[in-house]
């Protein structure tokens, strides 16, 4: 893990490694140099000596109103890295490297204006992906949020910043999320029950509880109480990039859920309880594998889900449709929204209503008929 402020890491062999930009390719890609020392302070001193020779000393910020965006973006990320979950750190680093750096890398902090940022947002909104297609408004909003954080950090270092940038907001237009119809859900349920194995039981569990795919993969049998008929969600699994910037390697990360409200206990219905109790597993280790040494990661579950949809003759959808479907069925069954919000692990009822609840046309028609009956003249 790096110490605050500089790109200095402690290696597994006990040495400290300092990284700096030595030069750049013709395309502007940075080429890094590395320094090694037996202590953090020695590595820091050697790194600062090299940077001073490059005319880019980080301890001269008070004299350097023209400090470039790249410097502050790297320093902000390193300074606050210990405050972020590992997955959050990797997410921020990716947004900086893939979107902010190509546009603002050599720009002077004080020269970045509201107009520049608006032009940047418009550009990535229309063709920000690698294939030249548009980014989602959610991703653009996330990128803008990181940019604001970096500029706030620069402002705290007495660098002039256009305050109008902080007022920019991206209007998000959420798309209707796909939900399985009742007939599609019954078709899927019939297949899962008729082909019992660990993965199919896991998919059925998501359909009946609304847990996320990462939460399913990290679920262990000791978090399921068949006697009390509930399951405890307290961790999630995902595959993320390593912290080494130049590496393309990834690793599995099992960590706490995305928020404190996502730590929750979910009651198990009598129908799901019967399936869990009948399944011939040793009921130890990970729920999906029955082993503490072998795990099944989200992309494997996603692939299985796609194959099942194909076998059922259903339209191909993302695994998250199970969560949306669960929430929608709960609303149709008139389950209390506050209760549903806690089962889903949301921090507020508003999130549940706006993001995951999609009343069907049939429910809307029934509501209108109820209104007509109420106001009709007898």
Summary of predicted features, one role per range:
Residues 187-191, 243-247, 333, 354, ...:
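DNA/chromatin major-groove-contacting recognition/catalytic segments
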Residues 11-17, 22-118, 281:
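N-terminal DNA-binding module of tyrosine recombinases/phage integrases
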Residues 156, 204, 208-215, 307, ...:
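C-terminal catalytic core of tyrosine-transesterase DNA break-rejoin enzymes
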Residues 172, 179, 237-239, 273, ...:
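Catalytic-site neighborhood detector that most strongly recognizes the C-terminal catalytic loop/helix
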Residues 77-159, 174, 294-300, 315-318:
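N-terminal core-binding DNA-recognition domain of tyrosine site-specific recombinases/integrases
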Residues 183, 246, 267-315:
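Active-site/catalytic core of tyrosine-dependent DNA strand-transfer enzymes
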Residues 134-137, 141-143, 156, 160-162, ...:
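Basic, Lys/Arg- and aromatic-enriched nucleic-acid-binding interface segment
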Residues 228, 239-263, 270-272, 292, ...:
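C-terminal secondary-structure termini that scaffold catalytic or DNA-interacting sites
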